[in-house]
Amino acid sequence: MFIRLTPDISVAGQIAPEDCALAATQGFVAIISNRPDGEAPGQPDAAAMAAAAAAAGLRFCHIPIDHSGFAMPQVEAMAAELAAGGPVLAFCRSGTRSTNLWALAAASHGTDPDSIVAAAAGGGYDVSGMLPSLRMLADKA
């Protein structure tokens, strides 16, 4: 259910509020929601997820990514949350947006783009198409 990309970040598709307790038992210290509220019927909103995370003793951060794509404020927010300490579980509908946002955030802090691509591939995600952006961000770090 939770796909480990590195020791500090795992991703998942949509989780339910009760999954926060499971995440805590698996050693996660924070949950990042990358899914906008109301994206799909029946989806728990960020407030419900934040309450469940707090009840499980976890930090919670909502960095929604909609279909318009990624912007630097979102990359910076993800990087800040990752820097606050992990391991962290990030989720969206399928885990793809969370993986892509992690990749951009990691590159923005100087992580080698090829190692980012390899870590994502190890979890079943292909971010190789982002290599030019990852290299640009890593070069500026």
List each model region and its residues:
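Cys-dependent protein tyrosine phosphatase-like superfamily
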Residues: 1-89, 100-141
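Short cysteine clusters
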Residues: 92
